[in-house]
Amino acid sequence: LLTLLADLSADKRNRVIIVSGRDRATLEKWLGHLPLDFIVEHGVWLRALGEEWTMLRPLTNDWMHEIRPILDLHVSRTAGSFVEEKEYSLVWHYRRADIELGEVRARELTSHLHFLASNSDLQVMEGNKVVEVKSAGVNKGAGAARWLSFYPADFIIAIGDDRTDEDTFGAMPSHAYTVKVGSTHRSLARFHLDTHHDVRRVLRALVEA
């Protein structure tokens, strides 16, 4: 995959943007050696190639001290789960927990957090074996739309495999090729690929086009 990204970004006609829920440090460690653009922490931070990180909009993390104990409580009640603290969001991961227990605890946590967020500028987001709390109005789609306002393109392809990628699909212009990977559940994407192997074949075809 790294080779494909390098080959795609080597063509000066292309701009390759990584849109991720991961934090800046992680993406820089994994992919910082490649000439890529980044939208990270679900749209909180944007960085075009050769430029500095900028925020989608001013945010505060003052709310974290109230929400963190709730997530920690679910960690104590769910073996294998853990909390990830980013700059402007908190994430409860349960990928390593018992499947059934993890799903039950996730529903409980989501319900509790939705109640707390109803009177605040926060939103609760469910992803792939994660529950995330962050500022309202910040998501992958908002970040992608902001990026496109700076760098419009004739050909756009957006590929994602997570629930949170639906925001990106929804933010794309009508001429964009939006592709959901994996789950065949209802999606805003126009196209579907079964596995990451199919994604690699598509990327290779783009390199060779």
Language-model segments: which ranges?
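Active-site phosphate-binding/coordination module
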Residues: 1-86
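Short amphipathic alpha-helical segments and helix-helix/interface helices
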Residues: 2-9, 110-113, 145, 169
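A structural signal for isolated positions on well-ordered beta-strands in alpha/beta enzyme cores
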Residues: 15-17, 37, 123, 157, ...
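Substrate-recognition "cap/lid" segment bordering the active-site pocket of phosphatases
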Residues: 41, 47-65, 125-153
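Short amphipathic alpha-helices in soluble, non-transmembrane regions
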Residues: 67-71, 104-117
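Mg2+-dependent phosphoryl-transfer enzymes with acidic/Ser/Thr/Gly-rich catalytic loops
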Residues: 136, 141-209
